[in-house]
Amino acid sequence: MEREKIVIELCGGRMPEKAHDADAAYDVFTKEDVKVLDWDRYAIPLGFKIQLPKHLAAVIQPRSGMSLKGIPSKKMWNGEIIKEKRIDADVELGLIDSGYTGEVKAIVKTMHIGAYMSGDIFIPAGTKIAQMRIVEIPNTELVSGVVKKEENDDKENGDKKRGNNGFNSTGVK
C-alpha cells in the first residue's frame, strides 16, 4: 500500500520523525530553548508547518516516558548550565485541523518545580517533547434528536449498558 505524502515546511525546526517504521506517531522536537516557570502553560514552537488533506488531522500528544519521568530541562545561571534535571511538566493534547497553516506548537503545562527554581529553567532546543499522530477524520454530521436510554443489558456480548454512568463507574479493577 502506498503511503500518503504530507507536506512539512520547516521554519527553523527539525523534521518530525519516527524512531521505527512501525511506530504509530512521529516524534516532534522543540525549536528553541523555552524558559519555564512553576504552574504555567506554554505553547512551545516545534519549528514546522504541516499541510494536511481535508480527510486528515494531526494530534499532538504526550510521550509516555515523559509523562512518567518528566520533561528534560536545564538550569542556567549567568548563561552557564549548572544543572540538568527532569521537571514536573506534561504535554497536553492538541488537535491540528487541515485548515491550520501556522507553525505547529506543543502545549506544555508545568507543575511544581520547587527548589529547582533558583536560576532560569529552560526546556532545551531539540528536546523530543511530544508525538504527532496523523488521524483520519470520518465524514459525519451532528443532528438534533433525543438520546434513547438503554434499559437492558447487552445480551449478545454480556456487557452492561453504560447509560449516564462514566468516570470509573465500572470500577478500577
Please name every model-derived segment.
Residues 1-173:
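DUTPase catalytic domain/fold
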